[in-house]
């Protein structure tokens, strides 16, 4: 072959194809199209059987190798007459000569997909059945063909079959196209290997005592969107999603509006989690990953939104709204009067959606309920921090387990507000103080480097509404001053984790103020 045959745009005609697939989707149509184009097909096992049953000419791999399938099909294609035809680099005359001397024909196309290992594991199958679904020959063929992409095109997804037939009809794939297919092929086998390695470590070689965090951590993501920029215009950014994950914000359907930005996604994620921290109908309004307002309602989602917005209308301008239930017409009408970047909900009444889409710039998303549990990843210089996701499932998150430190036991309405404020704390960046009344935040102090400033900020935001309200702190009061800031503004009951060396002083300050003070024994820092 001449040097010109290996240029990026040079096509390599397809005369011989090796096909071995577990997923038979589109197989017959592919084989028929290849045959009509004069391509010789070599195939294995059940793949060859399906092709032959349709009257399409096919050479079984055992005829090619002169060696039968053995060991229940574990050994089919692991043979020099197969892999030499895949790995011969035809840019090298000595490789072409070796094939000719051995009487081996090269393959120009490999079509392979792998045993359903992940699906088998997810089905709850036993260890032996899962092990049997670890593909050996398939990945070997895929990797061989992908390595030898100057000479071979490899396809691992039935969605690519139309492209194969188009290439066959028009002289083959270009070198640039074969490179792209090779990259996809190695990504495919990498995903497969990650799944097998993860399962093997957790199932066949677990640590003792058991741990949530394996010694080896492997994951893969797919880029699903290029974003306009990152947190700031000079930063490039993109969105990646985990194809095997529970559908979340990354898989949300956008029904209306401009493209989502990096900051839209971070705020929407915070809002979505915050709204589902509550069993009652809830609306969360978030900006810069902190709540402008969160509220629950036994009346309606519109009532919850109104109360959340009233917490801090100034900050809610340009915020992100999340509801944990269907958005009603009444709520949509209110939202349409406010500049809002994003609204996200599990559903919308048709008329509500029509109202929202009149606003050109609002982004309207529908998403599945967020999955609870799991882990969170945070890159640091030279490594990665992994932790269990902070959920409201600690012993101290149940008010039945709270300790009354001082004051009279809270009446049901006051206790409900304390529980609400405590649950909101999880969604607030530390140091966090939440003041609430009537199932709504009325003052939120967040992101302060000392707790007394967080208390002052919450009181300032709440204004006159603070008197008679309740408050929650995401961590203990290290000194009485933070609590005294709240009681001085008229807060009647407070809940905090406790655990400070000055707990007695804090409790004494609460007793002197005549308020109710509960200890949870749990903490909800967020950084």
Curated annotation (Swiss-Prot):
GO biological process, any: 'de novo' IMP biosynthetic process
EC number: 2.1.2.3, 3.5.4.10
SMART domains referenced in this protein's UniProt entry, alphabetically: AICARFT_IMPCHas, MGS
GO MF annotations in UniProt: IMP cyclohydrolase activity; phosphoribosylaminoimidazolecarboxamide formyltransferase activity
Pathway: Purine metabolism; IMP biosynthesis via de novo pathway; 5-formamido-1-(5-phospho-D-ribosyl)imidazole-4-carboxamide from 5-amino-1-(5-phospho-D-ribosyl)imidazole-4-carboxamide (10-formyl THF route): step 1/1; Purine metabolism; IMP biosynthesis via de novo pathway; IMP from 5-formamido-1-(5-phospho-D-ribosyl)imidazole-4-carboxamide: step 1/1
Listed name of the protein: Bifunctional purine biosynthesis protein PurH
Family listed: Belongs to the PurH family.
Gene field: purH
Entry keywords, A to Z: Hydrolase, Multifunctional enzyme, Purine biosynthesis, Transferase
One annotated Gene Ontology cellular component of this protein: cytosol
Catalytic activities: (6R)-10-formyltetrahydrofolate + 5-amino-1-(5-phospho-beta-D-ribosyl)imidazole-4-carboxamide = 5-formamido-1-(5-phospho-D-ribosyl)imidazole-4-carboxamide + (6S)-5,6,7,8-tetrahydrofolate; IMP + H2O = 5-formamido-1-(5-phospho-D-ribosyl)imidazole-4-carboxamide
Highest taxon of source: Bacteria
MGS-like domain location: 9-156
Record has Cytoplasm as a keyword: no
NCBIfam families: PRK00881.1, purH
PROSITE patterns from the UniProt entry: MGS
Domain notes: The IMP cyclohydrolase activity resides in the N-terminal region.
Database matches in InterPro entries: AICAR_Tfase_dup_dom_sf, Cytidine_deaminase-like, MGS-like_dom, MGS-like_dom_sf, PurH-like
Lineage: Bacteria, Bacillati, Actinomycetota, Actinomycetes, Mycobacteriales
